[in-house]
Amino acid sequence: MGEALIDIIVTPDGDIDSVVGGGPVNTARAIARLGTKVSFIGGISHDALGKRIRQLLDADNVMCSIDGDCAAPTTLAIASLDEQGAASYQFLIHGTSSLSVTPEIALSALDANATAVHIGTLAFVFTPLSQATRAVVAALDDDQILMMDPNARPAVMENSSEFWETFNSSLDRADVVKCSGDDLDYMFPDLNNLDAARDIHERSHATVLFTDGSQGVHVFMENDYFQCDVPKINVVDTVGAGDSLSGGFLSFWDRYNLKRSDTRDADKIRAAVEFGIKVAGLTCGRAGAMPPFAHELD
């Protein structure tokens, strides 16, 4: 659940390309390409860029839960890449399709049979989408897994109180929280990243996955901590890498019919994280958020 947008990608040399993006869309596409049934709750415009988004989701077998005819223009993100392929973002969001989702629309689109719900990025920040996110979290059944990824974007977070209200209320229900060093730097500027990730776990008792670039993924669980290594790869860019890890994690969970209670099992968490790392690694090896298909991991 969250935003669907177009990423305008600018290379260090000034070359410009565009791809379908938005953290929640990237996550949904990763899940679908791995063969898991998934639906996307988010506003998609009926303009030319919105049609491009919908066509790509259709091609990847991502179901769109909101069928409404959104007249607002498509949300845009400008992703500027540095020499290492890391992206920094600017957004054009006010008055666009991503903010067309109200709590009523989101609740009507929520599938009661969904085994897991993923939330994050701009859905934590801007009303009414943030309000819709909180409504969906409050409506989850006891057996539904909640995975959240704050994916903080300080450049557009004019209202940090809205972010914190959504984050904290969702954290009370969360089973798995994925966060990056950039997220933790923004959220806990007075703590080092490991202490910040540990703090999130201790506040919520959720399993926390701190993605630490080449240092791997640090996992904080009840009475346990471990680190999953990442292989050395040829990085083209990191756009969608964290989203692909989340998608891989959730697809693994579905593939092996794991339950909400299994999020307390360290062996199962480790296996799901390691699978997510493989998915993210393949995504980093190509330009834009282009997660792999299941056969590429065989």
Task: Show where each model-derived region lies.
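Active-site metal-binding loops of divalent metal-dependent hydrolases
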Residues: 2-4, 23, 122, 150, ...
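Short beta-strand scaffold segments in enzyme catalytic cores
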Residues: 29, 76-80, 216-220
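Short, conserved phosphate/pyrophosphate- and ester-handling motifs at nucleotide-, phospho-/glycolipid
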Residues: 31, 180, 242
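Conserved phosphate-binding/catalytic region of the ribokinase-like
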Residues: 189-298
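Conserved N-terminal subdomain of the carbohydrate kinase-like
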Residues: 37-121, 146
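Glycine-rich phosphate/adenosyl-contacting loop at the front of the ribokinase-like
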Residues: 1-62
